[in-house]
Amino acid sequence: MVLQALIIFFAQLIYVPILTLRTIMMVKGLKQKAAAMGMLEGVIYVVALGIVFSDLSNYYNMAAYALGFGIGLYIGAVIEEKLAIGYVSIEVNIPQKNQPLINRLREMGFSVSSSSVEGMASTRCRLDCTARRDREKEFIKIVSEYEPQAFIVSFEPRNFKGGYITKAMKKRREKYLKRKAKEDAH
């Protein structure tokens, strides 16, 4: 009885993070990875739910299912945050152009564009950057060191075309295809 509840609980701890990541992969357009995760998810789901449905009078199993689901959601969110899949667009609004800041961001590999914008009371400087999500905190830390009062907003772009990032992605893709062709030739 307790063993079944433990199996259900631990199955949920595996199932729900996979469910979370699969959903994110689908949203990000990573269909093949999402499909592979979906197959694994399906097997775990059927096993855990099968045990619960085998004895609906066993409240321990139902509690283990619900508790595992809740904790699994938390674990899935933590894993997703650590993986930081995808890209983020970051806008920075500062009182005036700060060339040392721009130079530092570029030295660190960030693609930064700057422009003058009309604020409520004055002309201000806006910095725009699209970067990998796993570098967002690094970007914000650098900006905060140079401009502690900066207004920073970030969001996930639905899609993008051209620019510094797509050139780099294209180069990585070409390297991958060359490497794959060499492996296939052997």
UniProtKB/Swiss-Prot annotation:
Location (main, coarse): membrane
Topology with respect to the bilayer: Multi-pass membrane protein
Location of the protein in the cell: Cell membrane
Residues annotated as transmembrane: 1-21, 34-54, 59-79
Highest taxon of the lineage: Bacteria
One Pfam family here: DUF5698
Protein family: Belongs to the UPF0316 family.
Protein name per the record: UPF0316 protein ABC1774
